[in-house]
Amino acid sequence: LPDFDERDGLSGQHLLALFAWSEYEFLHNTVGSPIRRIGYGRWLRNIAVALGNARRDASSDDKIRIDTALQTRANHTSEIVREHVAWALLQ
């Protein structure tokens, strides 16, 4: 089904690259995609959770990269994003 096909801008992306997207990039890259319905804040929250889970088994270098990315969202305007970033940093 075409609605479930991979979209340009999403397939093959690393979590860190997706987490770095601005709201404009999120909106631009999810045009026509059902993922757009969750909104930018939930997008960031979900990726923060994924990064926290990835952090558990990450190498020291990858943990540094993950932590650096998470820190960029530590003061996000959304409380839910801030809470999940804080959780992810403790994993």
Question: What do the PLM-derived regions correspond to, one by one?
Answer:
Residues L1-E23, I66:
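Non-heme iron-sulfur electron-transfer modules
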